[in-house]
């Protein structure tokens, strides 16, 4: 398969992928600063990033403008990218450390003229407003999904504070996507164990769910969830395809090829697509992961 053979769909890009400087305020928070020196410590050193400029370590992965992102999409064969109104809670500071607005995402969707798929997010400490925003985003702006970061709120996906979200997504007929696995930021990650989604999948059998971020370090459990539940899918965002576990690659190329979605988490469309195309799986499986599964799941 050549790079442009499939017009891919990135099911978890980020609003800041085309505007790097908007991540600056995140690095006022302990979690993001610590992530820079931990998860991204090698990159920090390689790029010679100085204290106080930690935001540049993630910005180095992004494009300088919306136009540059569209040009990259055209160059490598990416038809659509997903962007959501991300909300994340600081465990240390007890405040939202990421809080993107519905309106910002709507602007990205308008700019994209069909190339950007809009999504909402969820704050379980502001349930009423979150549900109102989700309904508005879907009904007025045509947004297609919700992405939720339960780990940052200290909640497992089966916590009762999350259930209003699932009910609303089911009512609106949209998938819910949420992070499982550990968090790159220093957040208590036990609640990210993929098996906590088991009860949700059973309680909401008609709700389409996407478990994001591969579930690492519990990849086998993530695979189990996708394989056992007809309504559960997963994406590989935040991990470069060449670094995926052999078990995940085997699953993606075999019995799980209809359940896995391509995603970058803003880590670079070109590198992430190139490495996916180079994986030792069939072209048919690659096509499903890069495009077909997303098109079917999100009714694109």
Spell out what each predicted region is.
Residues 12, 73, 105, 137, ...:
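Conserved, mostly hydrophobic/aromatic
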Residues 14-16, 86-90, 123-125, 151-155, ...:
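Short, solvent-exposed loop/turn segments at secondary-structure junctions
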Residues 19-25, 94-95, 131-132, 189-190, ...:
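Short aromatic-enriched loop/helix-cap "lid" or pocket-rim segments at secondary-structure transitions
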Residues 79-178, 183-184:
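Active-site gating/metal-coordination segments in enzymes
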Residues 140-148, 154-261:
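Catalytic pocket-lining loop regions of alpha/beta-barrel enzymes
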């Amino acid at each position: 398969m050549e790079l442009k053979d499939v017009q891919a769909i990135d099911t978890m890009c980020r609003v800041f992928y085309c505007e790097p400087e908007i991540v600056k305020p995140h690095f006022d928070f302990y979690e993001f600063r610590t992530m820079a020196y931990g998860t991204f410590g090698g990159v920090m050193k390689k790029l010679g990033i100085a204290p106080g400029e930690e935001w540049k370590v993630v910005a180095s992965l992004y494009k300088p403008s919306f136009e540059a992102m569209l040009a990259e999409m055209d160059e490598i064969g990416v038809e659509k990218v997903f962007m959501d109104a991300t909300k994340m809670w600081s465990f240390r500071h007890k405040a939202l450390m990421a809080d993107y607005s519905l309106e910002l995402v709507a602007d990205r969707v308008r700019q994209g003229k069909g190339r950007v798929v809009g999504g909402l997010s969820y704050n379980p400490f502001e349930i009423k407003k979150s549900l109102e925003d989700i309904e508005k985003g879907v009904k007025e702006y045509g947004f297609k999904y919700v992405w939720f970061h339960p780990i940052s709120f200290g909640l497992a996906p089966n916590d009762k504070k999350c259930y209003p979200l699932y009910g609303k997504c089911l009512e609106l007929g949209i998938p819910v996507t949420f992070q499982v696995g550990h968090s790159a930021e220093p957040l208590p990650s036990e609640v990210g164990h993929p098996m906590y989604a088991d009860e949700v999948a059973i309680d909401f059998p008609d709700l389409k769910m996407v478990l994001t971020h591969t579930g690492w370090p519990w990849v086998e459990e993530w695979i189990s969830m996708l394989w056992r539940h007809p309504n559960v899918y997963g994406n590989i965002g935040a991990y470069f395809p060449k670094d995926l576990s052999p078990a995940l690659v085997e699953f993606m190329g075999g019995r799980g090829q209809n359940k896995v979605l391509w995603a970058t988490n803003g880590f670079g469309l070109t590198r992430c697509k190139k490495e996916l195309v180079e994986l030792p799986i069939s072209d048919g499986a690659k096509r499903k992961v890069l495009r077909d599964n997303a098109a079917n799941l999100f009714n694109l």
